[in-house]
Amino acid sequence: YGLVGSEMCIRDRYSDASVFTSTEGAQQVLIGAYDWFTNGHYAHYTNQYIFFMPDVMADDAMVNSTGNYNRFVSPYQYSITPSSTYSVDPWIGCYSLIDNCNAILDNLETLPESSERNRIEGESLALRTYAYHYLIRMYAKPVNKYPDNPGVILRLTSSTTDIPRSTVKDCYVQMVNDIEKACTLLTGTSSSSKCYITEQAAHGIAARIYLDLGDYTNGTSHANKALSEITLMS
């Protein structure tokens, strides 16, 4: 709900055409995308819970029946239904984040050329890739075994036209292209806050994608870049 609130505030004050005439306006929309990770109901499923659900569905964690308020019980028991919040909310949350990123990427040409525009584009591409990487792992089969199976819907613009699911392979091709471009655009960026995607974070996302593909050469290269200039426990 944080994204909706922040985006609605912007739209109350500015038209869609005027908000993207400055990097400051585009930055506000980008902050709205980040809000999906931190605020509101869907944030639990698009960020906080995605790290726990795979663990409880594997052998890495168990659900404590005492004081747990029934959380993660259905993933733990493999009893998730199509209408379950564990099924629906990650989809809604990730595509809402993707929609914010698409709004920025659709309007980049209206922004003056600058290093700030490059950073905003890079962060938007990396965020969108992060969301798609989670979606493809949750709602599709592994790329190394089922590349031609249905993946997820690759919505790359703000258009609301219905489109079919792309193949798993095509989804990974898109993610690789986007995250490689993001790594280039974010070269040399840094942030005093750990809340925003920087060059190292983009390389970390890329490393995970390449590992899924079994491309260990590129995976190792990006992982090393992600760890560069970062000390243990930093």
Stretches with model-predicted labels:
Residues Y1-G5, I10:
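Single conserved hydrophobic/aromatic residue that forms the stacking wall/gate
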Residues L30, I98-C101, Y172, I179, ...:
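Inward-facing hydrophobic residues that define packing positions of alpha-helical scaffold repeats
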Residues A61, F72-V73, G214-S234:
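Hydrophobic-face positions in mid-chain alpha helices that act as interaction patches
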Residues N68-M138, S166, T184-G188:
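Conserved, well-structured interaction surfaces
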Residues L125, H203-Y210, H222:
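TPR/Sel1-like alpha-solenoid repeat signature
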Residues I136-V143, S190-S191, D212-D215:
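Short coil/turn linking the two alpha-helices of tandem helical-hairpin repeats
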Residues M138-K169, V173:
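Short coil/linker segments at helix-helix boundaries
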